[in-house]
Amino acid sequence: MPEFIIGARGHDFGRQTPEALFSAIGQAGFRCTQLAFPKAIEGVKSYADVTPSLVEAARAASKASNVGIAVDGTYVELSYADEEKRKAEVAKVLSQIPVAKALGAGCM
């Protein structure tokens, strides 16, 4: 039977650099996190700000702190009645699929 792992939402630790964020989560005793870049990483205002170098910094910080990324937190509204708004939200989700894969996050 798999070990039970306790995690925390990254943004409950405030907006920080990936290194500081993962360090704080690990020091608080958690082994995994939900990482929502726009809510938890300083300087990220939208998913467009999530660059490959930032994803790599988060991946490296996760590894260094031994805090896994269980969830790539992608906060979107997929039920807009307005088709253009809905399509914009779908595009956000699609842009984060490769990010989730790179981070090893099994859930979005």
Where are these regions (language model features)?
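N-terminal pre-domain/capping segments
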Residues: 1-107
